[in-house]
């Protein structure tokens, strides 16, 4: 336990001088004496001076204060005691419900599992959300990205996924709120409480108003808790909202440390930082981590370096579209843009594959015909195309679904649709079994039987 003293403070960056033979390692956690602040070593500048990032506010700190090296990285509580609790980046409880009472703490910087320990699998994870199960099915132990601009429903989709998976699969989840709104974190906590699934979720928050150090490390804190559950032999879910803010915090820290920026002002280590996080989110022979990550897309530009770097790591991408949201179709998932590695007849079966591809073909053809319809009207289309357009509009509406977590806003009860029902409904529409029903009957219903019932009332 060596000690040093603060020699410089610039915002969240603090330089600390140690005896030359006792300089802390990079990523060691330092504690400021007489303050609650923890610092993390980022660079060794020479002459016994290390440059650190503060994991919290630097208000009230001054030069000359004593700093103690803990000798290890930041460590956080892991295990069942974390379930139902809200913690910050350092693992301290922030829900005013007393100490965590953990039996074990792990450091947040860990090596990814080796090749020999990793395990692949093709088992599907049913979500109960029609458009996702049909067009971009999730793999157990896979990584999923929810891509979308501001206000198209990333967080609502994520809340619905957590609720459905906790209720239907009774697994443990870890939710890392990275640089998002505190109000959303609060809503999320109460939503989980009302759904009676809070005792299966560990919550870690580093919200928008916190210093960049907190936002950069909070994803690792959540991941460490998930790794513990995985190593105990469980199938655990890790939700990260929002991975873009993780990148953004990295950009801020990089600038504070004086590194040269790269494209669009991002940090030069963008790919490496993303890789360090993503490579740890993997399944081993003991258990699996299935990860769902919300990805904010700046200015709806998917070629921005941050979403583009994230794409490379994912097994499935769910793209939320502003155009679909503007039609009032929620979840606003774009079935033509969203993809999954699992969409393979050898994995999901021929019937599911044919139905998904059939739906995509009909919607793509409808998209092509829209220009003709806009200029010449429906009457100029062939009978075959008229029929296709009618089915496409039904499919488009049938892809919508009332959510449990949005009941308060929509006034209609949420629906969980099993995969078999989803396939039956869409293949029926493609085969023309429901050509006689009006398209309004398919809007905001669960299974196809509900659409038939709704049609009787129209």
Curated annotation (Swiss-Prot):
<dbReference type="InterPro" id="IPR050053">
    <property type="entry name" value="ATPase_alpha/beta_chains"/>
</dbReference>
<keyword id="KW-0139">CF(1)</keyword>
<dbReference type="InterPro" id="IPR024034">
    <property type="entry name" value="ATPase_F1/V1_b/a_C"/>
</dbReference>
<feature type="binding site">
    <location>
        <begin position="148"/>
        <end position="155"/>
    </location>
    <ligand>
        <name>ATP</name>
    </ligand>
</feature>
<dbReference type="Pfam" id="PF00006">
    <property type="entry name" value="ATP-synt_ab"/>
</dbReference>
<dbReference type="GO" id="GO:0005886">
    <property type="term" value="C:plasma membrane"/>
</dbReference>
<comment type="similarity">
    <text>Belongs to the ATPase alpha/beta chains family.</text>
</comment>
<dbReference type="InterPro" id="IPR020003">
    <property type="entry name" value="ATPase_a/bsu_AS"/>
</dbReference>
<dbReference type="InterPro" id="IPR004100">
    <property type="entry name" value="ATPase_F1/V1/A1_a/bsu_N"/>
</dbReference>
<dbReference type="InterPro" id="IPR005722">
    <property type="entry name" value="ATP_synth_F1_bsu"/>
</dbReference>
<dbReference type="Pfam" id="PF02874">
    <property type="entry name" value="ATP-synt_ab_N"/>
</dbReference>
<keyword id="KW-1003">Cell membrane</keyword>
<keyword id="KW-0375">Hydrogen ion transport</keyword>
<keyword id="KW-0547">Nucleotide-binding</keyword>
<comment type="subunit">
    <text>F-type ATPases have 2 components, CF(1) - the catalytic core - and CF(0) - the membrane proton channel. CF(1) has five subunits: alpha(3), beta(3), gamma(1), delta(1), epsilon(1). CF(0) has three main subunits: a(1), b(2) and c(9-12). The alpha and beta chains form an alternating ring which encloses part of the gamma chain. CF(1) is attached to CF(0) by a central stalk formed by the gamma and epsilon chains, while a peripheral stalk is formed by the delta and b chains.</text>
</comment>
<dbReference type="InterPro" id="IPR055190">
    <property type="entry name" value="ATP-synt_VA_C"/>
</dbReference>
<dbReference type="InterPro" id="IPR000194">
    <property type="entry name" value="ATPase_F1/V1/A1_a/bsu_nucl-bd"/>
</dbReference>
<dbReference type="InterPro" id="IPR003593">
    <property type="entry name" value="AAA+_ATPase"/>
</dbReference>
<dbReference type="GO" id="GO:0045259">
    <property type="term" value="C:proton-transporting ATP synthase complex"/>
</dbReference>
<dbReference type="InterPro" id="IPR027417">
    <property type="entry name" value="P-loop_NTPase"/>
</dbReference>
<dbReference type="GO" id="GO:0005524">
    <property type="term" value="F:ATP binding"/>
</dbReference>
<keyword id="KW-0997">Cell inner membrane</keyword>
<comment type="function">
    <text>Produces ATP from ADP in the presence of a proton gradient across the membrane. The catalytic sites are hosted primarily by the beta subunits.</text>
</comment>
<dbReference type="GO" id="GO:0046933">
    <property type="term" value="F:proton-transporting ATP synthase activity, rotational mechanism"/>
</dbReference>
<keyword id="KW-0472">Membrane</keyword>
<dbReference type="GO" id="GO:0016887">
    <property type="term" value="F:ATP hydrolysis activity"/>
</dbReference>
<keyword id="KW-0406">Ion transport</keyword>
<dbReference type="InterPro" id="IPR036121">
    <property type="entry name" value="ATPase_F1/V1/A1_a/bsu_N_sf"/>
</dbReference>
<protein>
    <recommendedName>
        <fullName>ATP synthase subunit beta</fullName>
        <ecNumber>7.1.2.2</ecNumber>
    </recommendedName>
</protein>
<keyword id="KW-0813">Transport</keyword>
<keyword id="KW-0066">ATP synthesis</keyword>
<keyword id="KW-0067">ATP-binding</keyword>
<keyword id="KW-1278">Translocase</keyword>
<dbReference type="Pfam" id="PF22919">
    <property type="entry name" value="ATP-synt_VA_C"/>
</dbReference>
